[in-house]
Amino acid sequence: MKFLLLVLAALGFLTQVIPASAGGSKCVSNTPGYCRTCCHWGETALFMCNASRKCCISYSFLPKPDLPQLIGNHWQSRRRNTQRKDKKQQTTVTS
């Protein structure tokens, strides 16, 4: 019984002394990421904190890329213009 009490006291003391490292430490002061050995779902590794830990940053904190215009819309607009030119040429030829 005394041994069980001693073990529980030791575990209670250790939980107060040892820091919880499940969340990881911050990468750099201005970076909204955490140093981890393996990134969670929805995160990507931006750079290495040290030899074995990556700086994992959530996708929501990353900038959104500027996407170019869709090629399909551009092609349709060119096609309409050529059809109009053909109609104009036919009307000028017949007049």
Swiss-Prot record:
Any one annotated GO CC term: sperm head
Signal peptide region: 1-22
Compositionally biased tracts (Basic residues): 76-87
The keyword Secreted belongs to this UniProt entry's keyword annotation: yes
Protein's GO biological process: defense response to Gram-negative bacterium; innate immune response; killing of cells of another organism
Keyword Signal: yes
S-S bridge residues: 27-55, 35-49, 39-56
Keyword tags: Antibiotic, Antimicrobial, Defensin, Disulfide bond, Secreted, Signal
Classification via InterPro entries: Beta-defensin, Beta_defensin_dom
Sequence segments annotated as region (Disordered): 74-95
Cellular location(s): Secreted
Main location, first listed in the record: secreted
Family: Belongs to the beta-defensin family.
Job description of the protein: Has antibacterial activity.
Protein name: Beta-defensin 132
Organism: Homo sapiens (Human)
